[in-house]
């Protein structure tokens, strides 16, 4: 089994509860810095970087409206709580992030030349990198517990964004998640889930494309974090479990790319990923 397995499961289970309880208000950082400040800050930076890439993508397609909406996600992620916490370490950087977001906003509204907007986004990215070095101790970046929490927070964000892609009513989300978890538990003797089987959800149409594009962007980040950190703590005897985790993460990408119903993500996250690291 994975090292620190009980810790990883506890952290991911806790974040999953946060996701269920917090469905009524979409705020990925409603619990910012409440449990492990280091891992949450790393997740915050990763999520902003996802939005930066999406802004560039839509600018290249001349879709300033979607670029603006993804910038709004950055503003949402950079909450007052995170800003205040960062200000305690370095007020200049905290202010520069705020100012740069505002500059990008103005340029998108005015439909400034794409290269100029891209340069401002690159500037924001550089400031974020500096914020990591200022905010975190070097030892934290090699801490296995931090890695596990970092991975867990990003999985939680993927879960949340994919839910909101379909805007399923809260009571249906709860029922469908429970049903998906029950179905997964009953099929654990099978080595994998058939993600194309009929699902309890009739809502198969994406209605929130900003959340959907965010979920897509998070998939690649989650895989990178898993392969570069969490996976490195696994012993040779855990190779079979690694294969199952690799398969589950690949299936996450297939579900999102295929725009399958949210219950399919629930099956993978709550039915495979959580149990495999418990």
Where in the sequence are the language-model features?
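N-terminal secretory signal peptides that target proteins for export/translocation
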Residues: 1-5
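Sec-dependent N-terminal signal peptides of Gram-positive bacterial secreted proteins and lipoproteins
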Residues: 6-29
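Mature extracytoplasmic or organellar-lumen-exposed domains after removal of signal/transit peptides
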Residues: 30-278
